Amino acid sequence: MSDPTHREVESQNDKPLEMNWINSKGEEIYLLVPKTVYPPREDTELLDLCISKIGNGNGRKLLEIGCGSGALSISAANNGWRVTACDINPLAVVATKGNAERNKVKLELFEGGLDESNSNSDFLHHFENDGPFDLIVWNLPYLSPPLEGEPRLGPLEDAGLIDSEGNEGWGEILLNLINQKPTLLKKGGAIYLLHTNNPRGNLLQSTWRQSLWATRIVGENDLEDGERLTYFSA
């Protein structure tokens, strides 16, 4: 069985990756990361550093969309944020729950995420009940959707790593949601998003500014392959 879906199913029997991740404050976070779940990488480290520059959360509310292994949410909770985290990959939610327990932090967790029409009632229910949030962070799926006939990842990896196949990318879909429901973000709150230097990413900040949001770059990282990761706040 060689198709992506079967490979994903078979990979769940593999031993999860064990790692000790060091956050921007030098704190060690022990993680078990199953296959198909996004582990902490350069982009995770960059966003963790950006959040740490805000200072201690002091009980303020943070929402992480697409929590993956939970590394970022656990780091934020360790530093005083009240964290709600979600992921559309059920294995990521399970991994984050287990990793939070291993590191003795409390998170609010749910399975789900945005959809292209912003009509996911379960996600909106959690979003509205747990908010308003002082900070919303999302390491956006930034791989370009494959063209017809090109190889795909498995369904879970596709959902977590590949940008929306519609006319709008996930960063713009989130913008539409916040504009429709501004009370999800606390007055004076901020949104931190990562984008890469692909065509959609290069336009994302100007798209937010066209909707009268002020944006500023809070962190950048140039990778060896020429890719540039940029975090901006709105």
Where are these regions (language model features)?
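SAM-dependent Rossmann-like transferase core, predominantly class I methyltransferases
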Residues: S2-N79, A95, D115-S119, I217, ...
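A short helix-to-beta-strand connector/capping loop
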Residues: G26-E27, N103-L107, W213
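Short alpha-helical
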Residues: P39, P90-L91, P199-R200
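Conserved SAM/SAH cofactor-binding pocket of Class I
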Residues: E45-G149
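Glycine-rich, phosphate-binding/catalytic loops in enzymes
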Residues: N79, R152-L156, W208-S211
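Short aromatic-enriched loop/helix-cap "lid" or pocket-rim segments at secondary-structure transitions
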Residues: S121-D122, L147-R152, L204, R228-L229
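Mobile active-site "lid"/loop adjacent to the S-adenosyl-L-methionine
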Residues: L140-I173
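Conserved Class I SAM-dependent methyltransferase catalytic core
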Residues: G169-Y231
